[in-house]
Swiss-Prot record:
Top-rank lineage group of the source organism: Bacteria
Chief subcellular location: membrane
Species lineage: Bacteria, Pseudomonadati, Pseudomonadota, Betaproteobacteria, Nitrosomonadales
GO cellular component: plasma membrane
Keyword Cell membrane (UniProt): yes
Protein name per its UniProtKB record: Phosphatidylglycerol--prolipoprotein diacylglyceryl transferase
Top EC class for this record: transferase
Gene that encodes it: lgt
Species in which this protein is naturally found: Nitrosomonas europaea (strain ATCC 19718 / CIP 103999 / KCTC 2705 / NBRC 14298)
């Protein structure tokens, strides 16, 4: 049996300014997004993405993650609490972000980016999908440091007692999600996108992969409260939200290979001088 280290949630404190580990994990995720994105641009000199677009994608994506992730948590998991404490919605530094809400927020943000640059929405999402998983993994490390989103009671040797739960050893499900939704998903999507794929295929594969890994990890994670209750039909809130994601990913993957859409056909060509700015 293990005991959670009970980290200080504040990583850096300078006078009244306190920087939390949870926020640093988000910063790490955004930094990895830029570094990996620049690498992909160098590897695809004739692609539709430029460094200027990548910087814009980060800006749009940050807004989508924060707004969508927070609103998703409020609506999907704790609507009753936030109706009684509406100002707490703004306290994002205390944690409480929903991946599925953030996913919808980023999808809308990338639609705005695609319209700005007159590109296919799927051409944009295909490019950024491989850049996302490591950031998701960093977020799960932030959850572990905070001692939140712990797993179900277990008798496995690595069961861990968390400070804000009862004294029962539990699965460190945050670390399971870090491994699967972060490292494994990154490796799969990065390798899959290394070769030319039909338009929308990389996005569809990401949706299937994340939804499947999240659904699997939910069997070890303590179910969250939500507007559907803790468990409905034996399915947790995270699984309910992942099932349509998997279904949409399968449909998108089928469409991509059925019609063999090509990014160069769906995306309007950028001027040569814009392409060569990298």
């Amino acid at each position: 049996m293990l005991v959670h280290p009970q980290f200080d949630p504040v990583a850096i404190s300078i006078g009244p300014l306190a920087v939390r580990w949870y926020g640093l994990m988000y910063l790490l995720g955004f930094s990895l997004f830029i570094l990996l994105g620049r690498y992909r641009i160098r590897q695809q000199p004739n692609g539709v993405f430029t460094r200027e677009m990548l910087d814009d994608a980060l800006f749009y994506g940050v807004l989508g993650v924060i707004l969508g992730g927070r609103l998703g948590h409020v609506l999907f998991y704790e609507p009753g609490y936030y109706l009684q404490h509406p100002l707490e919605i703004l306290a994002i530094w205390q944690g409480g972000m929903s991946f599925h809400g953030g996913f919808l927020g980023v999808a809308i943000a990338m639609l705005c980016l695609a319209r700005k640059y007159q590109l296919s929405w799927l051409a944009v999402t295909d490019f950024i999908a491989p850049l996302v998983p490591l950031g998701l993994g960093a977020g799960r490390i932030g959850n572990f440091i905070n001692g939140e989103l712990w797993g179900r009671p277990t008798d496995v040797p690595w069961g861990m007692i968390f400070p804000y739960a009862d004294n029962l050893p539990r699965h460190p499900s945050q670390l399971y999600e870090f491994a699967l939704e972060g490292l494994v998903l990154f490796a799969l999507i990065w390798l899959y996108s290394a070769k030319p794929r039909p338009l929308g295929a990389v996005t569809g594969m990401f949706m299937i992969g994340y939804g499947a890994f999240r659904s699997f990890c939910e069997f070890f994670r303590e179910p969250d409260d939500g507007f559907l209750g803790i468990m409905t039909l034996g399915i947790s809130m995270g699984q309910w939200l992942s099932l349509p994601m998997i279904a949409a990913g399968i449909a998108l993957l089928y469409w991509a290979y059925r019609y063999d859409g090509k990014p160069e056909k769906a995306a309007r060509k950028l001027p040569r001088e814009r392409k060569n700015r990298d």
